[in-house]
Amino acid sequence: MERSGSGVLSRSRAKTVTNGNSQHSEEESSDEEHPNDSMIRVGGDYQAQIPEFKPDCASRYGEKDQRSMLVWSPNSQVSDAMLDEYILMAKEKHGYNMEQALGMLLWHKHDVEKSLADLANFTPFPDEWTVEDKVLFEQAFSFHGKSFHRIQQMLPDKMITSLVKYYYSWKKTRTRTSVMDRQARKLLSKREKNESNDEIEEGDPGSDSDFEINAKKESAKQNSGNGGGNEKGPSKSCLTRKENQSAQYRHHPLRARRRPPKGMHLEQEDIVALSASTDSGAVTIRQLDTQLVSLKRQVQKIKQTNSVLRNNLGDGIEDMRPREPNQKINSRWTTEEQLLAVQAVRRYGKDFAAIADVIGNKTVAQVSSFFVSYRRRFNLEEVLREWQAEQEVQGSSGRTVNTELNGSAELEDDEVKMDGISPPHSDSPLPSSEGSASGNHSSAQSSPPLTQPPPLLRPAPPSAPPSLLRQPPPLQTRPLQNRTPHNHPPPPLIRPAIASTLHQGALRNSLSSSSSSAGQLPPSLVGLKVESPQSH
């Protein structure tokens, strides 16, 4: 069974070795550029010689792997001066550290010349930190802080990038109770106290418990070195006493200062007064307590006074505070805003500031541009005339009522006159019915445009009785009064009516002279025909 197993292993090894040899042969053939590179070589000449399998070799290989590698062993052939010069050259010129340089020298069997020649053939691993490098870095960091250029002066074989990388990895694993931290605290306390007495600093109980543990170890080593086992007991008791003294400040070592805090000063007279009698300290404390209570009362009283003043100040500030606009200025005109602007023009006329205040979200310039842009669309000129007429009416309200009454009475008289004036103008006998009807129809067509109200006002219904037509409302006469230059008592609608009746009489005379109809109507029917189209 063992032979079969060894045969299998040998075959597998043969395959692997043949593959390696074939690759190696192909590389050599490619280097030599033979023409038959793609040929497969078969035969015993092209096979590797495989040694027999020895199971004892595996254990020996394992033992070798578990052993540590020797880096350096001193030799009398190399002097200390030569060794220092070799290490300095390896560090400055090739970037080796001390351990790597000594390993190279041991590899060449303490031959300095061969080691110096072989240093340039290898590149040292830059991130490898020895214990010595770590201690030097902590010392440099305690002195210089994060000034990595100064730290590099203490570690010349390290690059700044390597120092920064190691700093962040060291910062994560850094503990508060390290030796360098304790040394930094001691230096800080020395700087703050500004004392030159080093013995007081060494006897200061403001150290950590780890420092005491290290002191225990050192004392134990000293006792073991001296061989006095019985001396361990009193040393432990002394250390426990020290621990009890420093237990109060173990987490806050900076509180164990000899000087009082800022703002407190020790005077000899006060100390003498306190030490004179036992009750003086209690009396002083009571006085300080009463003083503290009185000061607290004063603070509370001042707070109450401030709150009252603050409330009084807040009562009247709202009246003096300017009002913020509720609506933002918007240049777009909605339908509601347009209608509101038209009504505001009817109310305020061209007072654009008042119109802008009514709308709320428009400026005076926007209102004026609206008046110019929408003047024809909303007939703002007529609306403005109505406002002007209303202002004139409000200025002379009594006179306006009288003029309206006189105008209505004169309108009735003129209509009666129009009925009586038409027959005398006829040169021939009475006009025919057709002529009178055509004349009345033309007068009826010409009279309504003169008595129509403005476009924004509702016209009178055609089926209204004659009494309403003879007395128009004030809104219909107001725009017509503005057209007269001097506000004469007779309205302007009467004169065109008289002229039209004269023109109609002339037309009737011409028609009666040319017509050959024999039927003639009495004069009384002419006046009746004039009112008949208006009643319809």
Curated annotation (Swiss-Prot):
Amino acid composition bias (Basic and acidic residues), ranges on this chain: 24-36
Disordered: region residues: 1-44, 179-264, 389-536
Pro residues biased stretches: 450-476
Species the sequence originates in: Danio rerio
InterPro entries the record matches: ELM2_dom, Homeodomain-like_sf, REST_helical, SANT/Myb, SANT_dom, Trans_reg/Corepressor
Biological process according to GO: negative regulation of DNA-templated transcription; regulation of transcription by RNA polymerase II
Keyword Transcription regulation: yes
Domain ELM2: residue ranges: 38-123
Keywords linked to the UniProt accession: Coiled coil, Nucleus, Repeat, Repressor, Transcription, Transcription regulation
Domain (SANT) ranges: 124-175, 328-379
Biased composition (Polar residues): 391-406
Ranges annotated as biased composition (Basic residues): 249-262
Annotated Acidic residues bias: 197-211
Pfam families with a match to the protein in the record: ELM2, Myb_DNA-binding, REST_helical
Protein name per the record: REST corepressor 2
Record field: compositional bias (Low complexity): 422-449
GO molecular function list: transcription corepressor activity
Gene3D superfamilies per UniProt: 1.20.58.1880, 4.10.1240.50, Homeodomain-like
Coiled coil: 283-315
Primary role: May act as a component of a corepressor complex that represses transcription.
Localization annotation: Nucleus
Family affiliation: Belongs to the CoREST family.
GO CC, one annotated term: histone deacetylase complex
